[in-house]
């Protein structure tokens, strides 16, 4: 039976183990299957991502190829359009020649009107000269005023800088002094704390002495009880002697306690004086004129603790006198003492009530005289004197309040300093903006003057062309032919240069982009900022205009002086006009004008052809520049 039971148990154990093994196998298989499925899902997700990336890259490549083909087509179209434009330009030249032939007749008619206008313009020219001189005088005055204002602003700025530096140095000195005072106050506080600890240790010793005295008195009471009744005279003398010695000891203890209490009160008064000194320093920083304000507070703080000390001494003496006599006397003496105390109590109560009334009157007077005394804990009268721990807590609270007030004052001072700095910066910005506006106004006036002078120079050039004779015609024809040849050569050179410049521009753009990306990774240069580019270009253009203005003014002055000489020569070159009659003069002038008009017709045609050629050339350059810009943009997009 035993073997059968063992075999059954073993079978069950084996079966359980087999079941566990099978369960573990199933769990392991399930875990493997789960991990494999997760790995398959991750692999499928990665494969999908790579497929999508591959498809997107292929789509981008297709877009790039299509864009390239479009660009090539657009280039071909632009070339064809350029050829058509050249052909149209040739046709336009022929049409222009025909219109020039028609315009000759109109020019002859206009020439007669120009003679009348010429005289009008001479009078206007003289008026404009006067205005120009006046404007030059005003410009000089404005320049002098600007230099004066600039020098004044500079001096004011330097003075403000000096004042601020002085204020900064003064503030640093005041901060240094305050820190030193804070260190001294901390040292004093530590000394007071050490004194308080010493006083506490002494008080504990006095308490132990009191306990010892009480024990001694309790031990002496049974000895007194055993004394016989017949010897009442002798034992009464001994207790009185012992009582005297004990009273001497207690008076010594009381004196020591009073001394300790005086030390505590002095430490509290010193702390209060330090707090008052801190308040004075803070108020002196903000309001240096109010130096005499905290004096009554300090006097009240120093006078009131003396009264408190006297009251406290009286209370201690009364309490200790009551405690000393009770345990040492007999029952009969205790009864007598109680009766005496009951007799004295109403007198003491009356005295205490009188003292309380006097204290209340003093409080009302102090409240009316000094408002700040309510904050100090030493100024509050109490029927019971506060302990040193409570006074220390109140002093800590006062110190915390004073620290908070100092922090608030510092914050206010910082805010005021920041506001002043902001106002100073705003003023400087306004002054700078005003200077810039004055400069812009001056530049605008100079540009207006330059335009007026240019118009005057054009009118004077017309007069100069009228005065010039036949000698300049062959020179002008040669120059026109030379310029045409140069324009054709330059056009061919420009085409080649544009192609080379396009390639260089692409390389430079690629390099500049790489440099910009690197610079942007490190830090942004304000010169590369797109918001500042327009301003920089505007400033560069203004500088170029300022540099070119003196040259233009000199040329215009020369042109203004030159027509007067030419007019003088023209008048001096015709002596017959002065001698002949008025009719002959008019006839000769008409004949000369006809001859000049006939001679000037080819010159006018040549000049018009030049102007049109130049305009067409400029248009072609602008079109080429626009096409190059479009190409660069497209390449940049690629």
Swiss-Prot record:
The segments labelled Endosome targeting in the record are 80-175
Residue ranges for the region (Golgi targeting) are 38-107, 176-220
Q: Which residue windows are coiled coil?
A: 66-216
Keyword annotations for this protein, in alphabetical order, are: Coiled coil, Endosome, Golgi apparatus, Membrane, Signal-anchor, Transmembrane, Transmembrane helix, Transport
| Positions with biased composition (Acidic residues) | 348-361, 534-553, 577-593, 616-626
Q: How does it sit in the membrane?
A: Single-pass type II membrane protein
Gene Ontology cellular component terms for the protein in this record: endosome membrane; Golgi cisterna membrane; Golgi membrane
Keyword Coiled coil among record annotations: yes
Q: Where are the transmembrane segments?
A: 13-33
Its localization reads:
Golgi apparatus, Golgi stack membrane; Endosome membrane
* Main location, first listed in the record: Golgi
Keyword Cell cycle present in the record's keywords: the answer is: no
Membrane side Lumenal: residue ranges:
34-638
> What task does this protein carry out?
May play a role in endosome to Golgi protein trafficking.
Name the UniProt record assigns to this protein: Golgi integral membrane protein 4
Gene source species: Xenopus tropicalis (Western clawed frog)
Mind giving the lineage of the organism this protein is from?
Eukaryota, Metazoa, Chordata, Craniata, Vertebrata
- Which gene does this sequence derive from? golim4
